[in-house]
């Protein structure tokens, strides 16, 4: 196949061919469910949703795993603050996650494992690492990974151990042999709730964050699989540590290809609660429809930084409206996409080059121009069919355009009736006012011998 993907591990575009012909196995780091999902989560979910959609469009079967971290220091802290159990908090946040993902048109992954369901596999991997001399139990009961005993450490981040150590601000403490060593198993503390403690050969405790993904990935996809993805902020230390754990335990390459989506900023500043520019998905969906948010993400390349602002969202809304306006002109005909021809070939070439969604979106606009000129049902059908691969343009055009105008059909028809009554009473100033008010809301009235109809402004 002709698909090329940028591999963070090799720092190069690589021709993609799955380990098992015709079947892609992909793992993406999911959410830590102590709070509502934010914009950064939305970007990652949308980016890898597009990836799995295009892999399937390319004729490949996809086993897609996106995990849920449901045990973590932040989860424990929040549950204690709320006076609820860990399970109560995480169940509630997982329900909210699914609602947000569904709103954004995210297709459910094949598997969505909860970390707490895989503690036995984590303990097995820790035992293997200890048996190979790659892990040790410290005096405080924690089990740590001995980073300097794994020769490949730093290959994902591209840094030597000395460089990493120079940047490490944490002093050697709690029995660590080296500041770079990281925890595999956290010894239980007396003050911690009972529902965050598991029995183990190392004493009561809970798993560290990094070992969770290694164990779940190997359990569901095998010791070596095709793609591992996540946000750029996870490249180090999380993904570096996953490689050390998994390859240290199995002696095999963990993931052949590593993909990382770019950061999201707000008005050119890093999104953070301390700056007061932190937005949940639900905050954004109060102001913008979900497809506009998805379009805003998709029209930038997944590896590029993405700057959130009302100006950019307004622009995304206006751009998406232009595509739906084209679809409103003629009923799309069902089409069988011929990937070797014209617009479809250009779309495919864009997506086959590291999921080039900006170029693919440009093809959609060119095709929308063709629909505007020709009013061709086949061209409209192709526009809708190509949009589906990005999770776009599947709504009824009139419904989308009416929602954007802030009016429903009944409200528009009421205004049309009021205008007709004004004209009948020869109150032409009022009739013109109604027409102009609707135009300001993106609604164009069309008068004819049979009555008045409306369409969205182009």
UniProtKB/Swiss-Prot annotation:
Annotated cofactor note: Binds 1 zinc ion per subunit.
Record flagged with keyword Transmembrane helix: no
InterPro entries linked: Cys-tRNA-ligase, Cys-tRNA-synt_Ia_DALR, Cys-tRNA/MSH_ligase, CysS_C, Rossmann-like_a/b/a_fold, tRNA-synt_1_cat_dom, tRNAsynth_Ia_anticodon-bd
Residue positions binding Zn(2+): 29, 213, 238, 242
Localization terms from the record: Cytoplasm
Top-level class of the enzyme under EC nomenclature: ligase
Alphabetized CDD domains for the sequence: Anticodon_Ia_Cys, CysRS_core
Any one GO molecular function term: zinc ion binding
PANTHER family, alphabetized: CYSTEINE--TRNA LIGASE, CYTOPLASMIC, CYSTEINYL-TRNA SYNTHETASE
Name listed for the protein in its UniProt record: Cysteine--tRNA ligase
Gene name of the encoded protein: cysS
